[in-house]
Amino acid sequence: MLGKTIGKWLPMMAAGLIFLSGCAPVVKENGKTMPRIDGEAKIEWNRGKYPLAVETLNSHGEKERQVFYSPPKRVVAVWQNSIETLLALGVGDRIIAGMGVPDGKYIREEYRADYEAIPYKSLENLDTETIMMMRPDFIAGWSSTFTDKVLRSTEFWNERGVHTYISQNSDPANRNRTIENEYDDILNMGKIFDREEKAESLVKE
């Protein structure tokens, strides 16, 4: 089912990439009104697979390898494709903030309950300071996510021990936006979260 959904994501990304990069303003939340997001998801994972290296993009559109010593447990996900991919992989309980979706009705019905369980959900992006207070260990989003106007650069987060992942088709320098790139993103997420079999089944659907 997710494979069919990708076909819908891709035209939207190709046609609206420039517009969407600026349509979700950064919003500074009052710390007193933010939900407390303590602790982390209890997970089981194959320790023999880690450390593992995954190739991703940085804020300059350059490919680089990030090394993971364990699957992420406190995730910030930006835009619907990032959020739904994580929900489809069965790791929605690790998302502490999901941003870029105007309403839960836009999430696929089978993932909606898990989406609603995410502690913080909003169309608007949180500001950098608030996200740092949430103590994420992984941020997934688009190229436009990792700019000074939104959540700062990938380097900013990597220097603070936070892994990042940029959707390949969101790179403005990439003129070849394909479903295969989306499949690669799903497979990479599967590796990062120790959900490789699930990721492979998703791209075959």
Region roles according to the model:
Residues 23-84, 197-205:
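Bacterial Sec-exported substrate-binding components of ABC uptake systems
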Residues 106-107, 147-151, 175:
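Extracytoplasmic/secreted cell-surface and envelope-processing proteins
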Residues 76-134, 138, 142-144:
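A short, structured surface patch at a secondary-structure boundary
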Residues 73, 92-95, 135-137, 159-165, ...:
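Loop/turn elements at helix/coil->beta-strand transitions in domains of secreted/extracellular proteins
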Residues 153-205:
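Extracytoplasmic substrate-binding proteins
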Residues 2-27:
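Sec-dependent N-terminal signal peptides of Gram-positive bacterial secreted proteins and lipoproteins
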Residues 58, 99-102, 168:
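Residues at the C-termini of beta-strands that transition into short coil/loop
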Residues 74, 80-81, 133-140, 145-156, ...:
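Active-site-adjacent structural elements in enzyme catalytic domains
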